[in-house]
Amino acid sequence: MQGYLSAWLVKHGLIHRSLGFDYQGIETFQIKSEDWHSIAVILYVYGYNYLRSQCAYDVAPGGLLASVYHLTRIKYGVDQPEEVCIKVFATRRDPRIPSVFCVWKSVDFQERESYDMLGISYDNHPRLKRILMPDSWIGWPLRKDYIAPNFYEIQDAH
């Protein structure tokens, strides 16, 4: 089943894969990593001016990593704004996805958290560095194949 936005993307020659609708009726797409930045700009111009959230997850041990974006099209006088969910997948060997910081500034800390926990590198992000874990931390704690260390030496904050 194809939704309104999917039909609009096809009409304008924008390559994507529809993943259907979630339980709330929000359409979900898969976008190729190399196409993500240009499609993000187009969606912003089309009216998806609010990035509600960004998160990431490990699909399976040794498998792909996913970056998920929830976008909302806010218009005055509309009770039910249009929403869409975008999934961008990256390989575990080279997990690189274009940052959309220049499109939605609110993605700043969210992409940094995804980098910190899963190791997804967001190309052209202005401040991509660890945000939760210490800089000296080795590995990506939310990957399914991550082996937690037996201990970690906590340093004084002084």
Curated annotation (Swiss-Prot):
GO biological process terms held by the UniProt record: photosynthesis, light reaction
UniProt keyword annotation of Plastid present: yes
Membrane topology: Peripheral membrane protein
Reactions performed catalytically: a plastoquinone + NADH + (n+1) H(+)(in) = a plastoquinol + NAD(+) + n H(+)(out); a plastoquinone + NADPH + (n+1) H(+)(in) = a plastoquinol + NADP(+) + n H(+)(out)
Molecular function in Gene Ontology: NADH dehydrogenase (ubiquinone) activity; quinone binding
Localisation per UniProt entry: Plastid, Chloroplast thylakoid membrane
Function: NDH shuttles electrons from NAD(P)H:plastoquinone, via FMN and iron-sulfur (Fe-S) centers, to quinones in the photosynthetic chain and possibly in a chloroplast respiratory chain. The immediate electron acceptor for the enzyme in this species is believed to be plastoquinone. Couples the redox reaction to proton translocation, and thus conserves the redox energy in a proton gradient.
The protein's name in its UniProt record: NAD(P)H-quinone oxidoreductase subunit J, chloroplastic
Gene that this sequence comes from: ndhJ
